[in-house]
Amino acid sequence: MAYVITRNAADAEDATQDALVKAWRALGRFRADEPLRPWLLRIVANEARNRRRSAGRRERLVLRAAEGSGEAAPSPETTALAHERRAELLRALDELPDAAREVLACRYLLELSEEETAAALDVPLGTVKSRTSRALERLQEAYEPGT
C-alpha cells in the first residue's frame, strides 16, 4: 500500500515503519469490534501520503504484473510482447489520478473488499465503487494491448 502511494521503495519502507509505530501507540484507541487490517492500512496510507506530500516526489508507479502463461520456457516473441504490454499498462496506470490508482491497488493488488478499501482509504463505500468504475473505464480506454 505504501509503495503504491509513495512510488519509492525507501519512502514506502519508512512510511510503513512509522505507521506501525503510530499504530502500536494508538492500539488503545482501536475498536475491537472493527477489523484490524483496514485500520492498519488506513494508518499506513495516511503516513505514505504525508511522506509523499512533504517530499514532493513524483516518481513513476511500478507495479508487479503477473507475467507469463505458465510455460516452462516462453519464446522470445512472447517475452517481448509481455514486456511491451506491461509497459503499456504501467503508462496507462501512471496517467490515472492518485485516488484512482490507490483504489485499484487496494482492490486488485491487495485484494481488499470494497468495504475494506473504504476503511483503508477513509472514504465512503460509494466513493470506492465510483472510483473503481471510473478508473477501470479509463484504463480500458488508455490500455488497449495489441493496438
Regions found by a protein language model. Give the residues of each.
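Short, charged helix-capping/linker segments at alpha-helix termini
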Residues: 1-18, 29-31, 125, 142, ...
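Helix-turn-helix DNA-binding module
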Residues: 10, 91-102, 110-127, 138
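Short, Lys/Arg-enriched C-terminal cap helix and immediately downstream tail that follows
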Residues: 53-56, 96, 101, 136-147
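Structural recognition of an alpha-helix C-terminal capping motif at a helix-to-coil junction
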Residues: 14-21, 34-46
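Acidic, proline/glycine-rich intrinsically disordered inter-domain spacer in sigma factors
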Residues: 66-94
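Amphipathic alpha-helical recognition patches that constitute DNA-binding helices
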Residues: 1, 11, 35-40, 60, ...
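Short amphipathic helical patch at the helix-1/turn junction of helix-turn-helix
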Residues: 3, 107-109, 114, 133
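Arg/Lys-rich amphipathic alpha helix in sigma70-family domain 2
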Residues: 4, 25-32, 42-63, 82, ...
